[in-house]
Amino acid sequence: LRPKRESGARRALHEFLAVPLAIILGFVLLAVVTSVLDGLDVGWLQPVVRALAKVAPPSENQSMLRTVAPGMLSLLSITFVLLLTLVHRMADVFTWVVVEQFLQRRDNQAFFGYFAGLSSYFVVVLTLVDPDQAVFSTVAALVSSVAALVALVVFGYLVLDQLRPPSVVERIVQLTIATRADQVKWLRRVRDEPVLTELPGTPVQAECSGYLVDIDLDTLGRALGTARGAAEIEFRIRLGSHMVAGSDLATVRAEDPGDRERLADAVLDALRCGRERQLDREPRYGVHQLSSMGWASATQRDPEAALVTVDGLHTLLAYWTQKRTPAADSDDNADRLPVVYRDTTIPEVLSALANIAVGAIEGGQHQTCARVLHVFAMTIPRLSPEDQRMASAQVRHALPTVTRHPFTMELDRALTELSRVLSDYGHNDIAAELDRIEEGLKHQLPGR
């Protein structure tokens, strides 16, 4: 079945398992090395053995190892259960995004690997080494155990810090910006509008289900290079879109039926699907994560997390409007692949902001609604005309929610500012609607 499904094992290694497994393997190798050293009886090693024996006397090694090992395992197990329970609890409040970010952090992976590796070290040493000779093994166990206790304190702090809404949002924003920077290079190789619409087209349909996680432009470029005449591939879905069997993936256009058949096969070979979206390949997923977190937070009674999320979306808009992707004009179309891919990342951010404003009704968060309107007012002057129209449409859909909030000074300022900006940039109908809403809210105040 095509598109080919991404390997679950490879994804697990990339997302979390690679670092812990490598560290565990390192501890197992350390256990083997110290066991071999304990079994050696060579003259040049004896001064080292006598020096270490003062720290770990052979007569006490057996009881020391059998006491330290279970104690460390119990302590680590209890701590891990408590930390994972806390992470799960925060996921209930801020959606599953918290768990996903927790798993993908390299420092968390290293701590998990260290603690599991230390446990493996104890098991191997107790199995292989004669307790009366376990000098090197015992010293290594003591040093590693002290380091584990220190690491446990550091890990506990890091987990608590990572669960703060600003930390979660900042991490998502950083990853999304980095992924977007890579995607911009990719977008410069494709068109954003078709130019060969007069040619016959053949639809390309999915044979399996999953999320589109990758498009190999090199594969498409090679296939297009073998076409006998003019040809073009227009994608109907985007990275992160969910597909099912029979979903339209793309349309291939070429005069020759054989070219269309070969290009359709190349499209299916160039795509990869997976069971979940991937932030390291698709910036829209980062926007979706912030939107989900913002919606969940906006429906709660505490506005702090929702406000932080809105600020994160504002950061993305500010960064991307400064570094806008060049449009595919007629002069540089010749340098681009005849592949059409429409980017909707900025409209996704605008939609996420409007969604959070709607969700703020449930939590009664007039602060969040005002912040969203303020972000629209700050961002609209920096958007392209097309994105400005999209922003004004999102404002129009969010307007009914404004009347459901108490009319605070913060909300009053946001409405006034947004109305002025919309009027300055030619969206007079929505600006007038904002003015009517503001006047209606003012008449509800005592003394009016």
What is the predicted role of each segment?
Residues 10-11, 15-44:
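Hydrophobic alpha-helical transmembrane segments of small proteolipidic membrane proteins, enriched
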Residues 1-5, 10, 135-138, 153-239, ...:
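Short basic (Lys/Arg) and small-residue
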Residues 44-54:
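Membrane-interfacial helical/loop segments at transmembrane boundaries in membrane proteins
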Residues 29-42, 55-129, 149-156, 294:
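Transmembrane alpha-helix detector for multi-pass membrane proteins
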